[in-house]
Amino acid sequence: MTSELQQELQILRSFNYTIEKLTDGLSASKEKIKSFETSINNSNRLIQLWSSVLSQTEHTQNLILNSDWKGLSFDNEELERLQHQKMLQIQAEEQRKIELQQEQERLEQERRQKEEAIALQKQQQQRLLRSKDPKVRPARRAASSYVPSRPSHVPRSSSMNVRSRVSMATTSNPNSLRTPSSSFASHRQSAIPKSATSSAPTIPTSNLPSVASSIPNNGLNSSNRKSIISKTSSRLRPPSRVSNVPSVPQHPSTRSRTSTRETTQPPFTTNPSNRSKRTTLR
């Protein structure tokens, strides 16, 4: 048993010795491989240098053989030109972007202006439709087309009485028609209300029957004639003291005529005898 174990021990020792030699050989080969790697790198650098020298030699030969080559200075200028051209291209690209942005802003502004114009046009159309609305138009027509038939301070009864008296005088004596200035003056005098002349002295009405007898009947009864006489007596009052009453505008030429006609020719005179009677009353 012991002999067998010793034999096996000897075999293992021989294996160990062989392995140690193998490891020593591998370590030696490692160092050799490193040196081989270094030599390969050096040879690679030499090959690259040689290839660059060959390429430069070939390029120089081509330049020498090229008849269009103008020298190194021209090559430098050409290189600068290419760089400047590249810079211009970059600037043109930036300018194009800026112009595109400005064009978009302009289109946006035009679109907003069109929208504002359309909105304004719609507002104007709505205003026109409101102005043409039948609920609003009658009131405006009434306000614009209304013309007063007489001044606001003139009573309706006075204007009607003036018309009736003028028509009576015209039918009784067509030759006794007054001029437009005198009729305008009489209408102005009749436009003054009785309250404005209340402070003026009144004329006694003792001689009024003679005036009534001078006015033709023309189908009027005694009550109508008395009302006309009372109204004519109120019209004979001098309108000298008039206060706080707006007067009717009168042309300057007709103003002078009115004053002379009122003093010389009383209204509704039909003959000289009546004129003398009216003068006596005054």
Swiss-Prot record:
- Full protein name: DASH complex subunit duo1
Coarse class of the protein's main subcellular location: nucleus
Taxonomic classification: Eukaryota, Fungi, Dikarya, Ascomycota, Taphrinomycotina
On subunit structure and binding partners, the annotation says: Component of the DASH complex consisting of ask1, dad1, dad2, dad3, dad4, dam1, duo1, dad5, spc19 and spc34, with a stoichiometry of one copy of each subunit per complex. Multiple DASH complexes oligomerize to form a ring that encircles spindle microtubules and organizes the rod-like NDC80 complexes of the outer kinetochore. DASH complex oligomerization strengthens microtubule attachments. On cytoplasmic microtubules, DASH complexes appear to form patches instead of rings.
Where would you find this protein in the cell? Nucleus; Cytoplasm, Cytoskeleton, Spindle; Chromosome, Centromere, Kinetochore; Cytoplasm, Cytoskeleton
Q: Looking at the record, which segments are called Disordered?
A: 118-282
User: Keywords assigned by UniProt?
Assistant: Cell cycle, Cell division, Centromere, Chromosome, Chromosome partition, Coiled coil, Cytoplasm, Cytoskeleton, Kinetochore, Microtubule, Mitosis, Nucleus
Q: Phenotype of the disruptant? A: Sensitive to thiabendazole and osmotic stress.
Coiled coil regions, renumbered to chain: 75-130
| Compositionally biased tracts (Polar residues) | 169-189, 207-232, 265-274
The free-text function statement in the UniProt record for this protein reads: Component of the DASH complex that connects microtubules with kinetochores and couples microtubule depolymerisation to chromosome movement; it is involved in retrieving kinetochores to the spindle poles before their re-orientation on the spindle in early mitosis and allows microtubule depolymerization to pull chromosomes apart and resist detachment during anaphase.
Q: Please list the residue ranges that the record marks as compositionally biased, kind Low complexity.
A: 118-128, 144-168, 195-206, 233-264
The record's Gene Ontology cellular component field reads: cytoplasm; DASH complex; microtubule; mitotic spindle
Q: Which organism encodes this protein?
A: Schizosaccharomyces pombe (strain 972 / ATCC 24843)
Q: Which family is it part of?
A: Belongs to the DASH complex DUO1 family.
**What's one Pfam family the UniProt record gives for this protein?**
DASH_Duo1
Q: Which GO terms describe its biological process?
A: attachment of spindle microtubules to kinetochore; cell division; mitotic sister chromatid biorientation; protein transport along microtubule to mitotic spindle pole body; spindle attachment to meiosis I kinetochore
